[in-house]
Amino acid sequence: MSKLFIYFLICVSCILLTNYDTFLYGIIFILFALINLFNRYKLDKKTIIIVIILITFCFTKYFISKISLFETNKYFGIVLDKKDNYFVFFNGLKKFYVSYKGSTIDELDLIILTGKQENFHFSTLESGFDFNKYLINKGIFKSLNLENVDVIVGFPIQFYSFKESILSKFDTLEQKALVGGILFSEFDYNNDFANQVKILNLFSLFSVSGVYLNFFLYTFVKLFELKFTKKVSEILSLILFTPFLIINITRFTTIRVVAFYVFRMINKYNFNNYFSKNERISILGILFIIIDPFIVFSTAFYLSFLISII
């Protein structure tokens, strides 16, 4: 077990410790990580400092997201996610749930909105889906009661509008659920068919894990190798994949697959395979947690990383 992987486990453990439902897992993981770090490696000053920095950062990031800081009535930030009746807004420090049914804003738009911070509370659906827990696990602890919103810089691609235009071509909920899951890494858990697929783990395997995306990339590598070298084939496959990446640039599964693919190429051709697969996974995992610690609670994170490690 590499030291980088132990650092990765420590980061994951710290985030798990912040949630009541995963607290026990956090204890187990961090004890496992620290014991292995103590037994396998010399605990020099550098190692201790790195561990302290990682633990401090993870907990600080969590508490900044949870506590109320710099409350005002006007906020500038970016739209991280857009749904039918709400969007997720990020002001650089915290993410907010914003109820919204309009069509003037889309994902990755830079906006200024006026509103007041409030606590949110949603009823649990009959299917057992708890939207409150869903938002909290995404690092969203407050909502903004929207009074006004202005788009400062609109992103060139309207992701939500494009997705809706594609899904509108399908008549049944079953078709929309499958296409939405495969093309856009989205799934409607309120749909009976969706729940059936969820039970069978088909969606988790093909959509959340990104297995089919890796299959696409490496299949075309093999096809291009009939004509080109290995390196050129891998680059061409990535170029061919670029349109899919663009329309899913806000989806973790797609970003994770591309990041692993590109890092593997860089490690192979520029660093002469200096980093092992385990170390590459650890480095990217730590980077993802630094960007958004709450990604640890998503199925896409632990399922995709588990498959990658295996």
Predicted regions and their residues:
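Structural detector for short beta-strands of small beta-barrel domains
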Residues: 68-84
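N-terminal leader/targeting segments
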Residues: 1-67, 239, 254-257, 266, ...
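SH3/SH3-like beta-barrel fold
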Residues: 86-91
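Internal transmembrane alpha-helical bundles of multi-pass membrane proteins
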Residues: 8-12, 250-310
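Beta-strand/loop nucleic-acid-binding surfaces
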Residues: 92-105
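Aromatic-rich juxtamembrane segments at the membrane interface
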Residues: 139-266
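Membrane-interface helix-boundary motifs at transmembrane edges
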Residues: 37-47, 225-230, 270-275
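Flexible glycine-rich surface loops and low-complexity tracts that mediate binding to linear polymers
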Residues: 77-80, 106-125
